[in-house]
Amino acid sequence: MKPLRYTASALALGLALMANAQAVTTIPFWHSMEGELGKEVDSLAQRFNAENPDYKIVPTYKGNYEQNLSAGIAAFRTGNAPAILQVYEVGTATMMASKAIKPVYDVFKEAGIQFDESQFVPTVSGYYSDSKTGHLLSQPFNSSTPVLYYNKDAFKKAGLDPEQPPKTWQDLADYAAKLKASGMKCGYASGWQGWIQLENFSAWNGLPFASKNNGFDGTDAVLEFNKPEQVKHIAMLEEMNKKGDFSYVGRKDESTEKFYNGDCAMTTASSGSLANIREYAKFNYGVGMMPYDADAKDAPQNAIIGGASLWVMQGKDKETYTGVAKFLDFLAKPENAAEWHQKTGYLPITKAAYDLTREQGFYEKNPGADIATRQMLNKPPLPFTKGLRLGNMPQIRVIVDEELESVWTGKKTPQQALDTAVERGNQLLRRFEKSTKS
């Protein structure tokens, strides 16, 4: 009977372990963070899981922002959506209209977890809030602004002051020519050309990108980025491209790699690219503010955010939503939000995270790490510089990329390209407007 007793005990222990394993609520989290950023996402999830053994956050990289958004919406339609979906900022209007989401303020309320929406930096939270109620629909996560990265060693070689990055676009054009003449393969390259060269160029120089305060005041907005100021800017880049001082290297973040591998002396890219630059650059580099147009009357104004937020998907059970609320609360805690900001270069999404980072002396030890925040808070945003809320904006960005590429290849003039981009983009806006009223 002794072996039987042991067998029964072992069986009971096994059943208990199985019950405990089954009690763990798994929470799928689809994201677009790769490289060093992906490692930081995994680290956050592991720490949360260790502190909350009843829940298991499972981060999964699902490709770039467009791919992840498409995958998430497709999965929702088949009943297989993740609990948490990371969506880039220009997908906000699409997510709001999708009926696939559960507002984060509802998630916290139903979970009985206190949620102070005022803790988030207003210029960030305003992007993801319901225009009618003011409540957050998604939780800010990896918010960024474009910054200028420059190779200090290359500056020295070209006879430029390594502590003085270009302040205006006119300065940048001059610096790029000198850097190219000094032997650099590429004087200047830009990542995310639509976001930086049109969306943020417009806001930073106090110009609207679209009517209706960039879509915040209604879905009947029309695009307005084909005005003389934007055309002049693209024409300047076109001239730089003809001279070989500006190199077009791709639609997304390809310029960051061209920068940290030493090919390009300067790049405008996301502040969130800092993690990879820190890891891979083998030279002294600096971080500067986005250049502004020297002819713009009140520039610089304020930058608008890029990056992404975390959306909670519909159709999950109560326990899953409780775990989601706990995880989002974990991410917003000052020590976690500050660490994410410091390690990645993304903005501190809460006031407490910014204060903690400053108190820790991080900005003194890492000059330039506060540039993205300073740009966002440079001046109080105007009604048309607080961001974009335009339907089908991901597809509009593709159109902008196509039309700008037609400029770099000499097929169209800047005016022709921007006029066509506005015309094609407005067709998508009308389609979105119609879908929201049907």
Swiss-Prot record:
Function of the protein: Part of the ABC transporter complex UgpBAEC involved in sn-glycerol-3-phosphate (G3P) import. Binds G3P.
Sites binding sn-glycerol 3-phosphate sit at Y65, E89, S144, S270, G307, Y346, R397
Output one GO BP term.
transmembrane transport
Q: What is its main location?
A: periplasm
Is Cell cycle one of the keywords? no
The family database entries (Gene3D superfamilies) matched by this protein are listed as: Periplasmic binding protein-like II
The record lists the organism as Escherichia coli O6:H1 (strain CFT073 / ATCC 700928 / UPEC)
Q: Which UniProt keywords apply?
A: Periplasm, Signal, Transport
What Gene Ontology terms describe where this protein resides (cellular component)?
outer membrane-bounded periplasmic space
The record's comment on protein family reads:
Belongs to the bacterial solute-binding protein 1 family.
Q: Where, subcellularly, is it found?
A: Periplasm
Q: What is this protein called?
A: sn-glycerol-3-phosphate-binding periplasmic protein UgpB
Q: From which residue to which does the signal peptide run? A: 1-23
Q: What does the record note on quaternary structure?
A: The complex is composed of two ATP-binding proteins (UgpC), two transmembrane proteins (UgpA and UgpE) and a solute-binding protein (UgpB).
